[in-house]
């Protein structure tokens, strides 16, 4: 993909415009910024974590950033290329609610087996709590990752089998306004 070129080839721009919710001009602008920050044309896990640390200076986002990195890194080569970056950004910032929920499901399904187990969710929720640090005051019933996961599973795990399917996750998330709101945070920002 033209590693350190400051412009993408027209056919690449066209393809990314088809695969995302961005215009050709927006794709070019994002590429310019991506190459400025990642001259090699790729972003590794350490660089990704560094970006998260800028956004969450009062907590430790390392663990959460690693989980997000793994979802962005579609081809699992340990690096995020621009096409992976822009497609994930498109879903998280401008995707439909169902697209965002499928993306979030992939984030929580750490072993990619098609289910979110209690332990997988606990890993992610714990990482989120570490990331936000003491900057967020949580209600008593959610002031630990374990309590939050218990509440989520009580609401979403309809067949009580200890794991969530994509359908259970989507339906449960849509029924909880706070989850829908959290997924909409990026709307309109890009």
Swiss-Prot record:
Ca(2+) 2 binds at residues 109, 111, 113, 115, 120. GO terms for biological process: positive regulation of calcium-mediated signaling; positive regulation of exocytosis; regulation of neuron projection development; regulation of presynaptic cytosolic calcium ion concentration; regulation of signal transduction; regulation of synaptic vesicle exocytosis. One of its GO terms (molecular function) is calcium-dependent protein kinase inhibitor activity. SMART domains: EFh. It holds the Pfam family EF-hand_1. It is found in: Golgi apparatus; Postsynaptic density; Cytoplasm, Perinuclear region; Cytoplasm. GO terms for cellular component: axon; calyx of Held; cytoplasm; dendrite; dense core granule; glutamatergic synapse; Golgi apparatus; perinuclear region of cytoplasm. PROSITE patterns: EF_HAND_1, EF_HAND_2. Belongs to the recoverin family. This is Neuronal calcium sensor 1. It comes from Rattus norvegicus.
